[in-house]
Amino acid sequence: MAHRLLRDAQADGWERSDFPIICESCLGDNPYVRMLRAEYDKECKICARPFTVFRWRPGRDARYKKTEICQTCCKLKNVCQVCLLDLEYGLPVQVRDTALSTNSNDAIPRSDVNREYFAEEHDRRARAGIDYDSSNGKARANDTILKLQRTAPYYKRNRAHVCSFYVRGECTRGAECPYRHEMPETGELSQQNIKDRYYGVNDPVALKLLSKAGEMPSLTPPDDESIRTLYIGGLDSRVTEQDLRDQFYAHGEIETIRMVLQRACAFVTYTTREGAEKAAEELANKLVIKGVRLKLMWGKPQAPKPEEDEAGRQGHVAHGGMLPRAVISQQQSGDQPQPPGMEGQQQPASASYYFNIPAPPAAERTLYPSMDPQRMGALVESQEGDGKPGPQQAGQGQASSSSGQSYPEPPPPYYHGGQYPPYYPPYGGYMPPPRMPYQQPPQYPAYQPMLAPPAQSQASSLQQPAPATQQLGQGPQQQTTQNGMT
C-alpha cells in the first residue's frame, strides 16, 4: 500500500465521508441531532478497513449509537450502517433475498485480499458513476415483502441496554443508572451476529419473520352472497377517496366508497361479488397506500333492530330524544292528538319517556339563620315610595312578629372615606363561611341628664330654712349681737 500512497494520497483505500448512510429509525425522532465525526477511528466489521465513524444520540431516552460498517459495504447490500437492515423495506437481508429470490452473497468474496480488491473496484466504479449492482433498491416488492415491510420508524430499538449489574443484583445507581433495569430476554433472538445479519445466513430475526409470513391467514369470503363490501381500517389524513378508488378499481367496478374519518375507516362496495372476492384475495395483508399500511376485512351487515323498540324510537328520532315540556305534559295526561285513522286505538306506552327522565330528588339543603330574609331585615318598599313596606311584606312582617320574636334591622357598616371596598371573587373556588346571625347588643336604661330645680315663690323661700352654708355664715354675727346686748 506504500507505493499507492506515493502516487495518490486518496488511493489508500480508506473511507472519507461527511455524513453516514443510516435509516430513519437509527437517526431518531429528534430533528436536531449533534454528531461526532472521527476519521479512521474504527475498522469495518465486514471488510476490516478503517473508515470514518459517526456517533450521536437519537433521543433523550436513547443510547448513543455509532456506525458499524463502512459505506462501501453498506452500498453493496443497500443496508444501514448501524442496524444492517434494508434501507427501503426495513427488513433483514435474508428476508429480502428470500422474498426476491436473489442471492447477493455470490458477488462478495470472503478472503481478505479478494475482499479488499473487490471493495476498491466498487469504489472506483462508484466514483466513475457506474452502477455496480442495479438490483439493489430497484426490485419490485412482492407479496412477502408487502406483508412484512415496516412502513413507520421503530424508535424502541434505540433504547438503552440492560444493566448487567442489575441482573446480578449489584446496581447501586438506582434511578440515575443510564441503563435499563430489566431482565434480559432469553432465546434465539438474544444470540445475534453482525456478519450473519450482513450476509443473510442463520439470522434468527429473519427466520422468525419468514415463519410469521407463512402463518398469516387469508381473508375467507363470507357465506352470505349479498355481501359486496370491504372494510378498510387504519386510514390516515394522507389517504383520500381518490387514492382508494385508484387502488381498488383495478379489481372490479366500484359502486360506492364511503369514508368515515371519525373512525379512520372506509367501506368500498363493488357492483359484483366476484370483484370484491378478487380484491380481498390480492390485497389481503399487503394493502399499503402512500406508505400507510391499511387493514382489509370483509364488511359485516348491520344487526337488525328489535321490532318492539321500533315503535318506541319513532317519536324520538324526529326530535333527537328531547321533547318540549308541553308535549311531555300532553303525553302524560293522554291528551296527545292521534293521527287520522288511529282514533280509538291504544298507543304504545314505551315511547313517551326516553330521554325525559325525571330529575332525581334534590338533596336536603342546609339552612342557616343568615339565610332568613326576615331576620336580616330584607324589606321591600311599596310602590307609593313612602318608605313603608308593601302589603305582602307588611303582612309577612306582622305574621312573623306575632308568631315569634323579631329583631331590629342592624345598622349599616361604616367604611373609612365613605366608599365601599371593591368586591373580589373568591380565589380558587373558596367560599367564605356563612355570616353569623346578627346579635342585638344588651339594652341599657336611657341616660337622663341632671336638671336644675324649678323656681319657687318669694314667700315660700322665706318660710323654708336657710341652707347649711348660710347658717354657718350667719352664726358668728348672731353671736356678736347677743354678746353686745348682754
Swiss-Prot record:
SS bond partners: none
SUPFAM superfamilies, alphabetized: CCCH zinc finger, RNA-binding domain, RBD
One Gene Ontology cellular component annotation held by this UniProt entry: U2-type catalytic step 2 spliceosome
UniProt-listed InterPro entries: Cwc2/Slt11, Nucleotide-bd_a/b_plait_sf, RBD_domain_sf, RRM_dom, STL11/RBM22-like_N, Torus, Znf_CCCH, Znf_CCCH_sf
Zinc finger (C3H1-type): 157-184
PROSITE patterns on file: RRM (PS50102), ZF_C3H1 (PS50103)
Alphabetically ordered keywords of this record: DNA-binding, Metal-binding, RNA-binding, Zinc, Zinc-finger
GO terms assigned for molecular function: DNA binding; pre-mRNA binding; U6 snRNA binding; zinc ion binding
Chain positions covered by the region annotation Disordered: 329-348, 379-486
Record bears the keyword Zinc-finger: yes
Record field: compositional bias (Low complexity): 389-407, 415-430, 445-486
Residue spans of biased composition, Pro residues class: 431-444
Classification via Gene3D superfamilies: 3.30.70.330, Zinc finger, CCCH-type (4.10.1000.10)
Domain spans labelled RRM: 228-301
PANTHER family linked: PRE-MRNA-SPLICING FACTOR RBM22
Protein name per its UniProtKB record: Zinc finger CCCH domain-containing protein 49
UniProt organism field: Oryza sativa subsp. japonica
